[in-house]
Amino acid sequence: MSMDFNALAQQFTEFYYNQFDSDRSQLGNLYRDESMLTFETSQLQGAKSIVEKLVSLPFQKVAHRITTLDAQPASPNGDVLVMITGDLLIDDEQNPQRFSQVFHLIPDGNSYYVFNDIFRLNYSA
């Protein structure tokens, strides 16, 4: 494999969460019209709908702390699957919420875009 999918996953993850935590309205260029986001139970398609959902989330400040990051090649075409778990600190909360997120990244010229994005909060049973 010529591509280092682990390095790609690390770079993408750092960029995505830094951008999300500072100004999530700017995440639109990572998605395309065919992209899909499943956020908890909501499914949205297209960059515009996805960004509208992310911007509408009911918090002002957010910080993601990554606990695990796993990546695998997802097809012979260079697709990459990325799975992240971590903690989410919202506004002035002191107790983080656990989350999981999966990205399916598709090559697009010299970069990648998010084809699938699945986000889920992990509540203890």
Swiss-Prot record:
One Pfam family per UniProt: NTF2
Physiological role: Facilitates protein transport into the nucleus. Could be part of a multicomponent system of cytosolic factors that assemble at the pore complex during nuclear import.
CDD domains the UniProt entry points to: NTF2
Protein's UniProt name: Nuclear transport factor 2
UniProt keyword annotations, A-Z: Cytoplasm, Protein transport, Transport
All residue ranges annotated as the NTF2 domain in the record: 8-121
Organism: Candida glabrata (strain ATCC 2001 / BCRC 20586 / JCM 3761 / NBRC 0622 / NRRL Y-65 / CBS 138) (Yeast)
GO molecular function: small GTPase binding
Gene Ontology biological-process entries: protein import into nucleus
PROSITE patterns, A to Z: NTF2_DOMAIN
Subcellular location: Cytoplasm
GO annotations of cellular component type: cytoplasm; nuclear envelope
